[in-house]
C-alpha cells in the first residue's frame, strides 16, 4: 500500500515538473520583442493638477545610488549593484510627464560635457565655413539656464526586512513556500539656484517583494536499492528597477504638493 502511494505521489510530482517545464518554455517562446516600459503610476502622474503659469525650468545633474548595496545572493560574493546606477533617467522622465507634461521644462545637465563639446564643434565649423558671410558666422542660440536644481539619490536599500515561509515533509515528500521583502528609499530636494536655499525635501519608500514555492521528493524504493529524487518550483521577483522608478515618481508628486502647501506655486484655477 505504501509503495503504491509512493508511486502515485511520484507520478503527481513528475506531472507537476512537466507542467512547470512547459510553462517555462512558454515564457521563453512568448517573450516577444522589446517594448516600451510604461510608468508604474501613469494615473497618479496625470492626476496632478496643471501648474498655474509657465513651465518651471529645472536641472538634474545626477541622482546616484548612495547605498553601496550589492545584489543579495546565497553563498556567493556578488559584485553587481542592488539598484540601478542610472536612476536620473527616471527622475527626468517623471518631471517631464507629471501633470500631463504641464509642470517642468528639464534642461540637459547629465550629459553636459557632450553638449558643450557638440556646441564647440558647431562654433568651430561655422567659424571656418561662414567667416566670409556679411554678418560673420551664425551664432548659436544661448543655452537655457534653470531656476531650480533637483538633487538627491537612492539612500537606502534594506534586504530581508521581512522573511517567512511554510513547509511540510512526509515520507520523503515535501513542499514549501518562502517570501522575502526588501525596501528601497529615495530622497529628493529642490534647491533655488538664485539663493542656494533648499526649498523642499521629501523621502519615499517602496517595498520589493519576492516569492518562491516548490515541492520535492527524495525516497528509496525496493528495499533501498532504487532512489527517486525530484524537485520542482517557481519564483516571482518584483523588478528592483521598477520599484525605484515608482519611488521616484511618488517623490516628484509629493514635491509638487508640498510646494503648493508652502505657496511656492499654485495649481491652475487657484
Language-model regions, residue ranges each:
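N-terminal segment of the mature soluble domain
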Residues: 56-57, 61-160, 183-187, 191-200
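C-terminal motif of bacterial Sec signal peptides marking the signal peptidase cleavage site
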Residues: 13-16
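Extracellular loop and loop/strand-boundary signature of outer-membrane beta-barrel proteins
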Residues: 137, 172-176
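Short, intrinsically disordered/low-complexity patches at protein termini
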Residues: 129-131, 173, 222-225
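Charged, amphipathic alpha-helical segments
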Residues: 156-172
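Bacterial N-terminal signal peptides that target proteins for export
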Residues: 1-6
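C-terminal/domain-edge helix-coil "capping" segments
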Residues: 18-54, 158, 166, 178-270
Amino acid at each position: 500500500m505504501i509503495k503504491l502511494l509512493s508511486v502515485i505521489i511520484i507520478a503527481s510530482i513528475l506531472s507537476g515538473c512537466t507542467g512547470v517545464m512547459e510553462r517555462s518554455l512558454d515564457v521563453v517562446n512568448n517573450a516577444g520583442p522589446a517594448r516600451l516600459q510604461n510608468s508604474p503610476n501613469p494615473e497618479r502622474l496625470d492626476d496632478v493638477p496643471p501648474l498655474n503659469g509657465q513651465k518651471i525650468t529645472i536641472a538634474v545633474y545626477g541622482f546616484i545610488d548612495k547605498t553601496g548595496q550589492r545584489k543579495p545572493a546565497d553563498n556567493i560574493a556578488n559584485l553587481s549593484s542592488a539598484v540601478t546606477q542610472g536612476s536620473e533617467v527616471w527622475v527626468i522622465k517623471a518631471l517631464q510627464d507629471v501633470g500631463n507634461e504641464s509642470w517642468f521644462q528639464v534642461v540637459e545637465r547629465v550629459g553636459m560635457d557632450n553638449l558643450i563639446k557638440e556646441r564647440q564643434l558647431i562654433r568651430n565649423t561655422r567659424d571656418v565655413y561662414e567667416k566670409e558671410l556679411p554678418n560673420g558666422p551664425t551664432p548659436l542660440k544661448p543655452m537655457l539656464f534653470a531656476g531650480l536644481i533637483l538633487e538627491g539619490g537612492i539612500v537606502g536599500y534594506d534586504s530581508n526586512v521581512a522573511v517567512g515561509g511554510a513547509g511540510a515533509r512526509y515520507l520523503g515528500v515535501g513542499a514549501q513556500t518562502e517570501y522575502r521583502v526588501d525596501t528601497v528609499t529615495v530622497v529628493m530636494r529642490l534647491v533655488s539656484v538664485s539663493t542656494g536655499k533648499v526649498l523642499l525635501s521629501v523621502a519615499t519608500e517602496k517595498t520589493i517583494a519576492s516569492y518562491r514555492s516548490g515541492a520535492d521528493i527524495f525516497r528509496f524504493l525496493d528495499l533501498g536499492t532504487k532512489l527517486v529524487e525530484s524537485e520542482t518550483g517557481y519564483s516571482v521577483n518584483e523588478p528592483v528597477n521598477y520599484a525605484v522608478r515608482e519611488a521616484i515618481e511618488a517623490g516628484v508628486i509629493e514635491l509638487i504638493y508640498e510646494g503648493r502647501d508652502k505657496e511656492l506655486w499654485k495649481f491652475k484655477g487657484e
